[in-house]
C-alpha cells in the first residue's frame, strides 16, 4: 500500500467522523429545541436595566401593543407571562427614544485579537466578546450589530458561531469574498450567516483558505491587479460593510501570513491575549516586541495601518503564584494599556465547545457540565466585553 493511498483512507474517515460529530450535535440541539438563543427576561426584570423603570416599561409595552407590536410570551400555569427576547428589549429602548451606538458612530470599529502563539484563547476571546457585547444587559440599549470575520483556515470561530458552515466544502468564505471583490449586497446575502445570538453574524472560513493564503501574492496579481495585497480585507470587505455593523471582529490563525497582515492593516484596535504559562508568556512577549516591525513592513509596502493602540489582557489566568507573577510582568510591559479585566481559566469556556456554543449562547438547562461553572464563565465573558466596550468608547470619544 502506498503512502498516498493510506493518506486518502485516513482523510475519508476523518471527513466521515466530522459529519457524524456535527450531525450528533445538531440532532441534540433539534431535540432540545436549542437552535435559538435561550435568554429571555421577565417584564419585571427589565426595571434593573439602564434607563428603564417598572413604570416606563409598563407604559412603553402598553403603547407598543396598542400599535400592534407583539411581545414574546410563554405559558406560566393558567396564564401567559412576558418572555422578553433581547430584540423585544431593544425595541422598547427604541420606542422610548434612547439613542443607539450607531447614532454616535456611523462606521464600524474593527477589533483584532491577535497573538502568534497558538492556544492562547484568541478565538475563544473573539467569539465570547462578540456574543457578550451583543447580549450584555447594560449594552442592550446600544443595539450593537456585530460581525466576526473568520480568516483562520481551522474555522474555529465559524464552528462556535455557525457550526454547520465549519465543515465540508464552503465556497462563500472570507478569503473568497476578499479575492472576488463582490458587492455589498452579495456579501450580505451570500457570504454572511447568522449566529444563534441575533445581531451577531459570521463570515465563515474553510480549510481550503490555507491554500489561498500561501499563494496570496500570486492570486492578488491575477485577480486584483493594481490593488495593495495588504489592503484587500479592508477595501473589498470591511469598507463595504462599515455602515451595516457597529463592530467587526477579525479572527486569524497563529501564522505570519497574508491574512494576519490584512487583519492588522484593517484593524482600528489590537487586543493581545497574554497567557500566564511561562513558555507561552515568553512567546507572546516576543510577538509584542516585533509588532512595530510588522506594522512598518506593511506600511513600507504601501498600506498604512490605522491602529489606535494595542491593549493587553490576561487569558487562561488562574489563582497560582506563577500566574500572578506573569500578570504583574504584563502590567509592567503594557502599563495603562493593560485591560483591568482578564479571561480566567474556567471549565465553562472549554466545555461549551462540546456543543459548538459560546458561554453566552450555551443554555444552562441543557449544558452538559456544572451550571455554576457555566455561570462563572458567562459572568467573566460579560465583564470582559464591558471592559473592552468601555475602553473603545474612551478611545473613540477622545
Curated annotation (Swiss-Prot):
GO biological process: plasmid partitioning
CDD domains noted in UniProt: ParAB_family
Parts of the chain that traverse the membrane: none
Keyword list, A-Z: Plasmid, Plasmid partition
Gene3D superfamilies membership: 1.10.1660.30, P-loop containing nucleotide triphosphate hydrolases
Matches recorded under SUPFAM superfamilies: P-loop containing nucleoside triphosphate hydrolases
Function according to Swiss-Prot or TrEMBL: This protein is essential for plasmid partition. It ensures the proper distribution of newly replicated plasmids to daughter cells during cell division. ParA is trans-acting.
PANTHER family from the UniProt entry: P-LOOP CONTAINING NUCLEOSIDE TRIPHOSPHATE HYDROLASE, PLASMID PARTITION PROTEIN A
Protein name, UniProt field: Plasmid partition protein A
Gene (name only): parA
Amino acid at each position: 500500500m502506498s503512502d498516498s493511498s493510506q493518506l486518502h483512507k485516513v482523510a475519508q474517515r476523518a471527513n466521515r467522523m466530522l459529519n457524524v460529530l456535527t450531525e450528533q450535535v445538531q440532532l441534540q440541539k433539534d431535540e432540545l429545541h436549542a437552535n435559538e438563543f435561550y435568554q429571555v427576561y421577565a417584564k419585571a426584570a427589565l426595571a434593573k436595566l439602564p434607563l428603564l423603570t417598572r413604570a416606563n416599561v409598563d407604559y412603553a409595552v402598553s403603547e407598543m401593543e396598542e400599535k400592534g407590536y407583539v411581545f414574546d410570551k410563554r405559558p406560566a400555569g393558567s396564564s401567559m407571562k412576558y418572555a422578553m427576547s433581547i430584540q423585544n428589549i431593544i425595541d422598547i429602548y427604541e420606542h422610548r427614544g434612547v439613542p443607539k451606538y450607531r447614532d454616535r458612530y456611523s462606521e464600524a470599529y474593527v477589533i483584532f485579537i491577535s497573538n502568534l502563539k497558538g492556544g492562547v484563547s484568541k478565538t475563544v476571546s473573539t467569539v465570547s466578546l462578540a456574543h457578550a457585547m451583543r447580549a450584555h444587559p447594560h449594552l442592550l440599549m446600544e443595539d450593537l450589530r456585530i460581525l466576526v470575520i473568520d480568516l483562520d483556515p481551522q474555522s474555529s470561530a465559524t464552528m462556535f458561531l455557525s457550526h454547520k458552515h465549519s465543515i465540508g466544502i464552503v465556497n462563500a468564505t472570507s478569503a473568497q469574498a476578499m479575492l472576488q471583490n463582490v458587492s455589498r449586497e452579495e456579501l450580505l446575502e451570500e457570504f454572511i450567516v447568522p449566529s444563534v445570538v441575533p445581531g451577531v453574524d459570521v463570515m465563515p472560513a474553510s480549510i481550503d483558505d490555507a491554500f489561498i493564503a500561501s499563494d496570496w501574492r500570486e492570486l492578488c496579481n491575477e485577480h486584483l491587479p493594481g490593488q495593495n495585497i495588504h489592503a484587500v480585507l479592508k477595501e473589498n470587505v470591511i469598507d463595504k460593510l462599515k455602515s451595516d455593523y457597529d463592530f467587526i471582529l477579525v479572527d486569524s490563525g497563529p501564522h505570519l501570513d497574508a491574512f494576519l497582515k490584512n487583519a492588522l492593516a484593517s484593524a482600528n484596535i489590537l487586543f493581545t491575549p497574554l497567557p500566564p504559562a511561562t513558555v507561552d508568556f515568553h512567546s507572546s512577549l516576543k510577538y509584542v516586541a516585533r509588532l512595530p516591525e510588522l506594522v512598518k513592513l506593511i506600511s513600507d509596502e504601501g498600506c498604512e495601518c490605522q491602529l489606535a493602540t494595542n491593549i493587553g489582557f490576561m487569558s487562561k489566568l488562574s489563582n497560582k503564584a506563577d500566574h500572578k507573577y506573569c500578570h504583574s510582568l504584563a502590567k509592567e510591559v503594557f502599563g495603562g494599556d493593560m485591560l483591568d479585566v482578564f479571561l480566567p481559566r474556567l471549565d465553562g469556556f472549554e466545555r461549551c465547545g462540546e456543543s459548538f456554543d459560546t458561554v453566552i449562547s450555551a443554555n444552562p438547562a441543557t449544558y452538559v457540565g456544572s451550571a455554576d461553572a457555566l455561570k462563572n464563565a458567562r459572568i467573566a465573558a460579560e465583564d470582559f466585553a464591558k471592559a473592552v466596550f468601555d475602553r473603545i468608547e474612551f478611545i473613540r470619544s477622545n
